[in-house]
UniProtKB/Swiss-Prot annotation:
Highly N-glycosylated. This is Olfactomedin-like protein 1. Disulfide bonds join C141-C324. The keyword ATP-binding does not apply. It is found in: Secreted. It comes from Homo sapiens.
Length: 402
């Protein structure tokens, strides 16, 4: 590097000398001395620069060496740290598994305690529910159906659908006739004889209701007519026959009235019934050909007291009735005979289908438009192909409650 600097100095001298004026005898020694001195200063500066550069290079080499040593140490430390972190991760994982196991044991104990508590609550609720049902159905009625003894055709009309009945509670001889499945006219006859003979006096009293009924599921209970309002899917009307006004109304909950109650009764969506325990509603559950739902209604306030999902299907059913708190469902094939009871439901569970004989109705050519039980005279009132029929029943005592 020094040789290069000196060569550069010589070239610089030659370059500057080329521009100097011609030598003069008196000035040449002084000028040469001046230039020489300046070049010496320049050489000294270049020498210092060279020394500084060498020192920098040496320091940089030492620094690089130190960095290499430190990087080697870092790699060693990194390996040690990786090993330590790996061991720590294994310990944390082991500790987490132990914590999860302890938590599982705690949750298992809590779950067992919760299940025991839930089971105890369910048993208590079931006991209270059973007590409530027994209290609700605690009437002086312990009969069960054993057979249909005979039938009596009381009257013949041209209308295929309709209903007829007496008051289920009041000791009144009056007979009520409701013609058709959608109407608002009630005919009131003084007694059964006046109903049977057209020309008998007094003549029937005609009453036009302010609302029309739907289906053939009407009942007379304590002087009130209960029926399904035609203008709605699930409204029950309580009509005061004496005052000729709507006394009260209610909506059955749960989507009631969207499907037919019975497959072979094409106009009845809610079938009302009366027995020794009071007022009931029979309707279909959700779905096509679903099971029947039994609902107990408090007739005074029109409040729902309880509902039961029964095992009885609406498919192939044509009618049903209640006797002493037990639901009896009448079935037929394609709407033709024989008409028989093949499904019953007892909310108290005292009787089942195995306890009953084969229950057949006397053969009729068509399905029943309605069959209603009257707890006062213990008979069935039915409508079949325009015939108003009374069925006499054979009963026996139920088994005692356990």
């Amino acid at each position: 590097m020094m040789v290069a600097l000196r060569g550069a100095s010589a070239l610089l001298v030659l370059f500057l000398a080329a521009f100097l004026p011609p030598p003069q005898c008196t000035q040449d020694p002084a000028m040469v001395h001046y230039i020489y001195q300046r070049f010496r200063v320049l050489e000294q500066g270049l020498e210092k620069c060279t020394q500084a550069t060498r020192a920098y290079i040496q320091e940089f080499q030492e620094f690089s060496k130190n960095i290499s040593v430190m990087l080697g140490r870092c790699q060693t430390y990194t390996s040690e740290y990786k090993s330590a972190v790996g061991n720590l991760a294994l310990r944390v994982e082991r500790a987490q598994r132990e914590i999860d196991y302890i938590q599982y044991l705690r949750e298992a104990d809590e779950c067992i305690e919760s299940e025991d508590k839930t089971l105890a609550e369910m048993l208590l609720q079931e006991a209270e529910e059973e007590k409530k049902i027994r209290t609700l159905l605690n009437a002086s009625c312990d009969n069960m159906l054993m057979g249909i003894k005979s039938l009596k055709i009381v009257k013949k009309m041209m209308d295929t659908h309709g209903s007829w009945m007496k008051d289920a509670v009041y000791n009144s001889p009056k007979v009520y006739l409701l013609i058709g499945s959608r109407n608002n006219t009630v005919w009131e006859f003084a007694n059964i004889r006046a109903f049977m003979e057209d020309n008998t006096k007094p003549a029937p009293r005609k009453q036009i209701l302010t609302l029309s009924w739907q289906g053939t599921g009407q009942v007379i209970y304590k002087g009130f007519l209960f029926f399904h309002n035609q203008a709605t899917s699930n409204e029950i009307i309580k009509y005061n026959l004496q005052k000729r006004t709507v006394e009260d109304r209610m909506l059955l909950p749960g989507g009631v009235g969207r499907a037919l109650v019975y497959q072979h009764s094409p106009s009845t969506y809610i079938d009302l019934a009366v027995d020794e325990h009071g007022l009931w509603a029979i309707h279909s559950g959700p779905g096509t050909h679903s099971h029947l739902v039994l609902t107990k209604i408090e007739p005074g306030t029109l409040g729902v007291e309880h509902s039961w999902d029964t095992p009885c299907r609406s498919q192939d059913a044509e009618a049903s009735f209640l006797l002493c708190g037990v639901l009896y469902v009448v079935y037929s094939t394609g709407g033709q005979g024989p008409h028989r009871i093949t499904c019953i439901y007892d909310p108290l569970g005292t009787i089942s289908e195995e306890d009953l004989p084969n229950l057949f109705f006397p053969k009729r050519p068509r399905s029943h438009s309605m069959i209603h039980y009257n707890p006062r005279d213990k008979q069935l009132y039915a409508w079949n192909e325009g015939n108003q029929i009374i069925y006499k029943l054979q009963t026996k005592r139920k088994l005692p409650l356990k």
